[in-house]
Amino acid sequence: MSEAQLKTSLEALSQNLLPGNQNHCSFDFQLKEIDDSIKQVIKCALVAAEIKNNECLDMLDSGIRELLDAKQRLLLMQQSVDTLANKTSENISDFENKSLLDIYTQIFKELIQEYEEKSDYGKYGTQGEYIEFKKTIWHEQNTDGSDFPSMKTFFNVMNTEEQEADEVMVYSATFDNRCPLTLQPIVHPILSTACNHFYEKDAILSLLNPTCVCPVVGCEARLQRSLLKEDEILERRLRRAQEISNLKEA
């Protein structure tokens, strides 16, 4: 197989996998479809938790896991193409009597087998989308501001190396709905993806120039506009916390 033939074969193999393609089989299209579906599942989970429909929550849990599996398969397909391209560029003579498709298939099988052998915690416990899914349900079911537990709680993980990779997603036991800048209840929250602290939107944006240190005492995270995002679930949680506070004061 000549170098030109090899290059042509690789391009054909990656046509429907690599980012940038516009057809419905492209990597970008499929990944976007999965991400959009995951967002819808999380929104449905909020409603299901609110009306205490546990059967629906179980179905949504299974659904989001299937979507995350599908997303991982896509990413591993892309990784397989990248690995194949690297291998061929290193030593083209190794591919004289081998089919690129067979080699690609073998690489993909090894990667997918490694993924499938992981525990449920290993597959989902540190995935941002699954953590958000569990957070959404937890905060709707625990409006008193209880700590969001370690993700290993949802998988019955005990003293394994996987615990070391657990996401740190703990909120204060006393849920403080006041902005660290205005010291007033937050009405329009914006969340820092750098440290998970949140603030009144206008207050923190006025502090950026173009960056600033997180105003929460003891936090040294440096903020910039691209690290701040609006979060409708957080806004809902803050609103519920304020409603509970008003009832207690009445």
Swiss-Prot record:
Enzyme class: transferase
Annotated Zn(2+) binding sites: C195, H197, C214, C219
Keyword Zinc-finger: yes
Pathway the protein takes part in: Protein modification; protein sumoylation
Biological function: Acts as an E3 ligase mediating SUMO/Smt3 attachment to other proteins. Acts in a DNA repair pathway for removal of UV-induced DNA damage that is distinct from classical nucleotide excision repair and in repair of ionizing radiation damage. Functions in homologous recombination repair of DNA double strand breaks and in recovery of stalled replication forks. Plays a critical role in meiosis.
Xref: Gene3D superfamilies: Zinc/RING finger domain, C3HC4 (zinc finger) (3.30.40.10)
Protein name: E3 SUMO-protein ligase nse2
The record's account of how the chain is modified after translation: Autosumoylated.
GO biological process, one term: meiotic cell cycle
Gene Ontology CC terms, in alphabetical order: cytosol; nucleus; Smc5-Smc6 complex
Domain of life of the organism encoding this protein: Eukaryota
EC number, UniProt record: 2.3.2.-
Subcellular location: Nucleus
ZnF bounds (SP-RING-type): 164-243
Species of provenance: Schizosaccharomyces pombe (strain 972 / ATCC 24843) (Fission yeast)
Similarity-based family: Belongs to the NSE2 family.
Subunit structure, interactors included: Two subcomplexes smc5-smc6-nse2 and nse1-nse3-nse4 exist. These subcomplexes are then brought together via a number of interactions, forming the Smc5-Smc6 complex.
Keywords: DNA damage, DNA recombination, DNA repair, Meiosis, Metal-binding, Nucleus, Transferase, Ubl conjugation, Ubl conjugation pathway, Zinc, Zinc-finger
Molecular-function annotations in GO: SUMO ligase activity; zinc ion binding
Outcome when changing C195S: No sumoylation activity
